[in-house]
Amino acid sequence: MIAFDTNLLVRALVADHDDQVAVVRQLIASDTIFLSRTVLLETEWVLRTRYRIPRTDLSAFFAALLETDNTLIEDADAVSHALDWYAQGADFADALHLAACGSAVMHTFDRDFCKAARDAGIAPELRVLEV
């Protein structure tokens, strides 16, 4: 098994450097690929901000990763929940943080995060702290 850094995963999608894409494809064909939650988080940010890839395309890309036979995603159930919420309009980072909490109650000062989660019908409990 080999672990991918963000730049390898980005190359796999955007295919903007032929030599690097060839290496990434060879790695994918040769071994099981481990993707950490942090790599997924950074990949979403890079693809959204630098490459301006639309949310629907990002959702499809990450959903396909979950279904790929030779890919092992850290905490795949939490990532799957986060992707469901992301598809409903939640921020990917917020959704992933919340999904990773499991049964723990997420506490935050971020009212917008709390409101967006509730509006999207996201089930885990989320509390805004007042100061």
Language-model segments: which ranges?
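Acidic catalytic patch
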Residues: 37, 61-87
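Conserved glycosyltransferase catalytic-site signature
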Residues: 6, 76, 92-98
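A general alpha-helix detector
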Residues: 8-9, 42-46, 61-64, 81
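Short active-site oxyanion
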Residues: 30-32, 70, 102-106
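Acidic, PIN/NYN-like endoribonuclease modules and their adjacent C-terminal/linker elements
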Residues: 100-131
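Short, well-structured N-terminal submotif of metal-dependent ribonuclease cores
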Residues: 1-35, 50-60, 68, 123-131
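Alpha-helix capping/helix-boundary segments
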Residues: 39, 78, 97, 112-113
